């Protein structure tokens, strides 16, 4: 009698396991097809010189596919030249994306003077540096949760000259 009960329990466990696997597959497929915001880096420009360092600003366009606004949890960035990280940081809670539209985010990047001077020594011939900017935009999408969209761009940044200081 115990072996018959064990068979019934095993059959029920098998059916439940099969249903759970089907449910996981269904939800994974549905979540994979959920639209997410799309982002592109439009421009990276020299902004100015302060007492703390050299300021650059990246303009990032983010398209929201939803009719409701989506909160941005944080923006993280890493600015590299060659293989060396020259600036990194995080901007907590920078605002929200407008519903069914494109939001342009301004990502300020500050390069310390010590790093800028060493870059000037390395790049004194053409007064610009080749860079790679990696940005991670973290959004809080209802039902799905927090997602991070990586955006990367490469190009050249103008180094400040003496006329930028005066």
UniProtKB/Swiss-Prot annotation:
One cellular-component annotation, GO: cytosol
GO biological process, one term: response to desiccation
Cited Pfam families: LEA_2
Domain of life: Eukaryota
Annotated Gene3D superfamilies: 1.20.5.170, 2.60.40.1820
UniProt-listed PANTHER family: PTHR31459, WATER STRESS AND HYPERSENSITIVE RESPONSE DOMAIN-CONTAINING PROTEIN
Family statement: Belongs to the LEA type 2 family.
The protein, known as: Desiccation-related protein At2g46140
């Amino acid at each position: 009698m115990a072996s018959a009960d064990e068979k019934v329990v095993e059959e029920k466990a098998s059916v439940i396991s099969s249903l759970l696997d089907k449910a996981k597959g269904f939800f994974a497929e549905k979540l994979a097809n959920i639209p997410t915001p799309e982002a592109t880096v439009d421009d990276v420009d020299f902004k100015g010189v302060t007492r703390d360092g050299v300021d650059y600003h990246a303009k990032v366009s983010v398209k929201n596919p939803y009719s409701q606004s989506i909160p941005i949890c944080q923006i993280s960035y890493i600015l590299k030249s060659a293989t060396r990280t020259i600036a990194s940081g995080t901007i907590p809670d920078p605002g929200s994306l407008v519903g069914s539209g494109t939001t342009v985010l301004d990502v300020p990047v500050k390069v310390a003077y010590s790093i800028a001077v060493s870059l000037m020594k390395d790049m004194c011939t053409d007064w610009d540096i080749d860079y790679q900017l990696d940005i991670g935009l973290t959004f809080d999408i209802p039902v799905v949760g927090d997602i991070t969209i990586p955006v990367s761009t490469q190009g050249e940044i103008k180094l400040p000259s003496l006329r930028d200081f005066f």
